[in-house]
Amino acid sequence: MQITWLGHSCVLLSGTKKVLVDPFIEGGSVIDTDPDIVAVTHGHEDHMGETVALGKKTVAINEIAKYLKTKGIPAEGMNIGGTINLDGVTFTMTPALHSAWIEEAGIGCNGGAAAGFVIGMDGVKVYHAGDTALFSDMKLVGELYHPDVALLPIGGRFTMGISEAMMAANFVGAKMVIPIHYNTWEKIRVDPAPFKEAIERTTDMKVKILQPGESVEIMPSA
C-alpha cells in the first residue's frame, strides 16, 4: 500500500483500491485524486471538504451518510465499533473525542459523533485517528486491530498536541506513525521534529514526517 499525505488530515491510500480520507486541503483541490472510496471522519468543513464534489462512494457515521444522500452521494452509513467491507477494503469505525457539527450555509446540522477509522487493504491496516483528544481506549485500537500505521493529529488547540500524541502512539503501538493535522494554519503550527525524535529515541516505532504530496510505501506484516 502507498500512503500519500496531501496535507492537513487528508490522506490517500493506494493499493487494490484508492481510498481518500477527509478530502480537504487548504487552498487546493483533491478532485484529481479520483478515489474509488471516500472516508469522512466527521462533519467539520476541513474534513468533509470536497466530499460532495467528488461524488464517490463514501463511508461515514450514519448521520453524515444520511446528509450526504440528500446531496446525491452514494454514502455507506455505519457507527462506532462497526466494520464494513467495500470492494475488498475494510473500514472499522473507532471513537474520537471531538465535536462533529456539519457546517453548511452558516447554519449547520447534526453530524453525529466524531470518529476515526482502521482501514484494511492489501494486508495492511492503517489507523486514521481523525480529530481527537487523547483517550485511554486508544489502547484497544492497538489490542483489537493491530494497525501497521497510525495517523495521529499533533497540532494542538483543536486536537491533541505533541505530548499527548506521543502517548497515543504508545497506546496504539503501530510500527510507523505519521503526524497529521498540523501546520495548516498558524493556530496549529508545530514543529514535528521533536515528536519524531522522542518516539524513535524511546520506542521501536518509526515516525515518518511527510511533506504535502509525499508518499511512503507500506508492506504487509509478515
PLM features: what roles do these ranges have?
Residues 1-33, 77-143, 212-222:
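Core dinuclear metal-dependent hydrolase active-site scaffold
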Residues 4, 69-83, 166, 170-222:
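Binuclear metal-ion centers of metallo-dependent hydrolases, dominated by the metallo-beta-lactamase
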Residues 12, 53, 67, 198-201:
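Alpha-helical scaffold elements within enzyme catalytic domains, especially in hydrolases
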Residues 20-22, 35-44, 58-61, 127-132, ...:
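Active-site neighborhood of phospho(di)ester-bond hydrolases with catalytic His/Asp-centered motifs
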Residues 25-76, 144-151:
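Active-site metal-binding motif and surrounding structural segment of the metallo-beta-lactamase
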Residues 27-28, 44-49, 65-68, 82-85, ...:
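Active-site environment of divalent metal-dependent phosphoester hydrolases
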Residues 34-35, 52-55, 73-74, 106-107, ...:
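Short, glycine/charged-enriched secondary-structure capping and boundary segments
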Residues 115-175, 180-189:
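Metallo-beta-lactamase
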